[in-house]
Design a protein with these regions (language model features):
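Short amphipathic alpha-helical segments
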Residues: 29-36, 75, 79-82, 86
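Short, intrinsically disordered, mixed-charge
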Residues: 38-46, 81-92
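N-terminal catalytic cores of peptidoglycan-degrading enzymes
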Residues: 1-31
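Short loop/turn segments at connectors of secondary-structure elements within structured domains
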Residues: 6, 46-48, 96
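Short, highly charged C-terminal tails/helix-capping segments
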Residues: 95-138
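Short low-complexity stretches enriched in small and charged residues
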Residues: 15-22, 37-39, 118-123
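Short, internal acidic amphipathic alpha-helical interface segments
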Residues: 22-63
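Well-ordered alpha/beta subsegment
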Residues: 54-81, 89-99
Length: 139
């Protein structure tokens, strides 16, 4: 498991010529599609072995392919390591870009009811959630 994205469902398919890896990162963004997709495309230029993509519903995946001849223990380890690294390091950024309004609403709802906000603390600064009343309730 990662530190930000605790689970990353991953499908590995073996065909006659390749090993394909597809890992679910997050559902279709609620907003800021252009900003979210632009960030993903720019990030693709810097990534090793996998790239961001979308399914027919707009959900975000990491996908990679190895030729069957490269599907050694080391090759599989590298591609799965890339999936873990990029899913984990990209998760909060994708949430900030594509779900900011929902996160703000959830924060306000929890603060108003005295509910724990500890799993939203990563978004305090980037989304401007640092209201003094709200930060007093961070658990």
């Amino acid at each position: 498991p990662g530190e930000r994205k605790l689970q990353t469902p991953c499908r590995i398919s073996v065909s006659a010529h390749s090993v394909d890896v597809n890992a679910f990162v997050c559902r279709r963004p609620d907003e800021n599609f252009e900003g979210t997709y632009r960030w993903m495309l720019e990030r693709n230029l810097k990534m090793f072995a996998v790239a961001f993509g979308l399914d027919a519903m707009g959900d975000i995946y990491l996908s990679g392919r190895l030729p069957l001849t490269a599907a050694t223990a080391d090759g599989i380890d590298k591609i799965l390591g890339s999936v873990l690294e990029y899913a984990d390091t990209s998760f909060n950024v994708l949430l900030e870009l594509g779900f900011a309004s929902a996160i703000r609403k959830e924060w306000a709802w929890r603060v108003a009811r005295g509910e724990p906000t500890h799993n939203l603390t990563a978004f305090i600064e980037p989304l401007g959630l640092s209201d003094p009343e709200a930060t007093d309730t961070v658990n």
